[in-house]
Amino acid sequence: MDPRSEVILRQHDYLKGRVLLINAPNDALVSQLPTEIDASVWTWNYADYQGFLNAGATAHFSVEFPLQEFDQAIIFVPKSKELLNYILHVVMSHLKIDQSVFLVGEKKGGVERAAKQLQSFGKILKLDSARHCQLWHLKIEKTEKIKPLESWLKTYTVQVNEQELTICALPGVFSQTHLDVGTAVLLPYLNQVKSGRIADFGCGAGIISCYLAKANSSNIIHALDIDAFALQSTEMTFSRNGIGSDQLRLQPVTGIADAPTELDAIVSNPPFHQGIHTNYDASEGLCQNAKKHLKASGELWIVANRFLNYPILIEKHFGQCEIKTDLQGFKVLYACA
C-alpha cells in the first residue's frame, strides 16, 4: 500500500460522513476504511480511475469537482504547484466553513510547501509524520467563489512549419507555459507524417494534434492521454485555433493497448512521469505494440531522449527504425509497419 494511504488509515478516526479522496493512489485504501465512512474518489488519471471502478469504489474521472456534496476532503498533494492551487480553489469553493480538509503527501513531493498554501484558508495542524509522509488538517475558516475553468488556462504561441498555433494548457499538463525541447525537435518533421487517421499518444496540451489537424483538414486526430486535464487542454487548443470538432477524437487511455486500430500513423512525445516518479512503461509499451494499431505501411513517429534504447525496441518489433535527427539530447525515430 502507498505510504500516504497508510498514514490516512492510521488516522481514520478524524474521518466522518461523505469523504472525497482527491488524487488518491490506486490501492486498497478505500476498501480498508471503516464502513461508516462514505468515501468517493476524484481522479484525473484514467488508469487509476479504472482501478477504482474495478475494485467497486465510487470514482469520478474529471477535471472538475464532482457534482455532489461532501463533508470532508483529503487532498493527495500533486507534483504540480499550479494543479495544487486549482484543487485548493475548487475544494474551498465547494466545502463550507468549519468543514475539514486533510492534506497528505511525501516530503520529497512538496507536502510542507503545500501545507503553507493551506494556511491561507485557516489554522492548520500536523496530525502525523511517518514513512517520509506528512498528514495535515485544516478546519475551513475562509471559502472561495468558484472561478471558471478557462481562467486557469495558460496560453502561448508556437510557430510550426510556417503555421502559428495558440496552445492552451490547464494546470498540471506537461509544458503548461512553453514548448518543451522534445516536441520542438519533432515539430519540423510533422509535415512528413502520413495523412488519414492519426493518433497522438500522450497528447498533452494538443500541440502535435493541432498541427496535424490544421495541416490537412481531412486528417482525423485521435488525441490519447491518461490525464483528463490533458484531454481537456487539447479540446481547448483545437477550439482556440478554429479547428472543427469533427477532426478530433478525444480518448482517455491507460496505455497504447486502448488505442484505435487501423491507424495511418501514430505520433508521440511519449510520457515518462507518473506523479513525482519516472515511469517508462507507457513509452516502452508504445514501441513494442504500436504496430498492432497501424495499417499496413502505417507510420510510427516518436521523439525521445537519446539515451533511451527505443531504436532497438522499435527495430525488434517493426524490423527497422530510422533516426531522422539527433538534436539537443533528443532523437526523432521513424518506423513503417
Swiss-Prot record:
Main location (coarse class)? cytoplasm
Q: Does the entry feature the keyword Methyltransferase, yes or no?
A: yes
What's this protein's function?
Specifically methylates the guanine in position 1207 of 16S rRNA in the 30S particle.
Q: How does this protein assemble?
A: Monomer.
Query: Could you tell me what reaction this enzyme catalyses?
Result: guanosine(1207) in 16S rRNA + S-adenosyl-L-methionine = N(2)-methylguanosine(1207) in 16S rRNA + S-adenosyl-L-homocysteine + H(+)
Pfam families xrefs: MTS, MTS_N
Lineage, highest ranks first: Bacteria, Pseudomonadati, Pseudomonadota, Gammaproteobacteria, Moraxellales
Does the keyword section mention Iron? no
Write down what this protein is called: Ribosomal RNA small subunit methyltransferase C
A cellular component term from Gene Ontology for this protein is:
cytoplasm
The text of the family note is: Belongs to the methyltransferase superfamily. RsmC family.
Q: Where in the cell is it found?
A: Cytoplasm
EC number of this enzyme: 2.1.1.172
Q: Which GO terms describe its molecular function?
A: 16S rRNA (guanine(1207)-N(2))-methyltransferase activity; nucleic acid binding
- Keywords carried by this UniProt record: Cytoplasm, Methyltransferase, rRNA processing, S-adenosyl-L-methionine, Transferase
Per its UniProt record, what SUPFAM superfamilies does this chain match? S-adenosyl-L-methionine-dependent methyltransferases
